[in-house]
């Protein structure tokens, strides 16, 4: 009977160790997935930042060109008078 108890405790111990190891691996996998998601989010933020900057520069250039065109039109109108 004593051998049976020891065997049973040993089997339960091995099962507990196995369960603990699998839980640890599961947490590591989740951490890796979270890290990959964070890296992808950073890439997206960087991309949106570049797009935003390019849009601002394009808007400034368009406004500058429109201002020059308006100034030229006014100068021509004044020059004709």
Swiss-Prot record:
Keyword Signal in annotation: yes
Cystine residue pairs: none
Region spans: Disordered: 22-49
Propeptide, chain numbering: 23-45, 80-81
Any one Gene Ontology BP term: innate immune response
GO CC annotation terms, alphabetical: extracellular region
Tissue specificity field: Expressed by the skin glands.
Signal peptide bounds: 1-22
Modification Isoleucine amide, positions: 78
One Pfam family in the UniProt entry: FSAP_sig_propep
Keywords attached to this entry: Amidation, Amphibian defense peptide, Antimicrobial, Cleavage on pair of basic residues, Immunity, Innate immunity, Secreted, Signal
Compositionally biased residues, Acidic residues: 30-41
Location within or outside the cell: Secreted
Family the UniProt entry places it in: Belongs to the frog skin active peptide (FSAP) family. Dermaseptin subfamily.
Function: Antimicrobial peptide.
Designated name of the protein: Dermaseptin-S6
Protein source organism: Phyllomedusa sauvagei
